[in-house]
């Protein structure tokens, strides 16, 4: 959908009823003792079609990586083994799937909306220490409500700006060394371009 947006002549969005966003994403993990530092290492791609003036359906793909450094400490790996090391933790999340959007004033140049995204999420939980890496991969179910606004500086609405706030929850689980995760909660914001 993104490549099509650049190849088409400038007119009211991708088509009279289509939309697309390309966003930088800032993600803040919640209730996470593995890698809970806020991070701007993320993107969001979304495209869809308005089946009525207000209701749209589409597809999305997003990703984010959160990192956290842990100073040297001793980890009891088992009853007979321990390890003293510092660690760099990394939590990568890749949700994708269907999006549903309700826009409030479609005829305006400033269009607020509510959205819901649903689909699978791939996650990778990694701990880097010295020259080694321990990791766990998992798939889960993802749900994310979002509130945002699309702003077009010109009447033709060919290119605009997109701002959104979101919350997300995924059922992913993981275990690395002595750390475990059971569900991933996040909130954040997205800034980007709208087509």
Positions of PLM-derived features:
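Predominantly the C-terminal beta-signal and adjacent terminal strand-loop region
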Residues: 66-72, 84, 143, 148-195
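Bacterial N-terminal signal peptides
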Residues: 1-7
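Outer-membrane beta-barrel translocator domains and adjoining extracellular loop/strand segments
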Residues: 32-39, 69-76, 124-133, 173-180
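Gram-negative (and chloroplast) outer-membrane scaffold detector with strong preference
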Residues: 17, 46-129, 140-143, 151-157
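Membrane-embedded beta-strands of outer-membrane beta-barrel proteins
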Residues: 22, 43-45, 96-100, 114, ...
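Outer-membrane beta-barrel pore domains and translocons
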Residues: 23-29, 62-64, 117-121, 164-170, ...
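Short glycine/proline- and aromatic-enriched beta-strand/turn motifs that initiate or cap beta-hairpins
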Residues: 11-57, 192-194
């Amino acid at each position: 959908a993104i490549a099509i947006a650049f190849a088409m002549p400038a007119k009211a969005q991708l088509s009279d009823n289509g939309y697309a966003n390309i966003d930088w994403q800032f993600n803040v993990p919640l209730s996470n003792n593995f890698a809970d530092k806020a991070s701007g290492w993320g993107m969001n791609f979304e495209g869809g079609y308005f089946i009525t003036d207000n209701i749209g359906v589409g597809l999305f793909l997003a990703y984010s990586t959160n990192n956290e450094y842990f100073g040297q400490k001793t980890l009891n790996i088992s009853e007979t083994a321990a390890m003293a090391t510092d660690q760099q933790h990394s939590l990568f999340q890749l949700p994708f799937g269907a999006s549903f959007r309700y826009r409030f004033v479609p005829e305006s140049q400033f269009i607020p909306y509510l959205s819901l995204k649903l689909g699978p999420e791939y996650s990778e939980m990694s701990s880097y220490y010295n020259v080694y890496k321990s990791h766990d991969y998992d798939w889960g179910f993802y749900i994310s409500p979002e509130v945002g606004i699309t702003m077009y500086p010109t009447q033709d609405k060919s290119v605009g700006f997109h701002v959104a706030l979101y919350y997300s929850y995924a059922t992913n689980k993981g275990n690395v060394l002595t750390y475990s995760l059971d569900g991933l909660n996040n909130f954040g914001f997205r800034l980007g371009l709208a087509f």
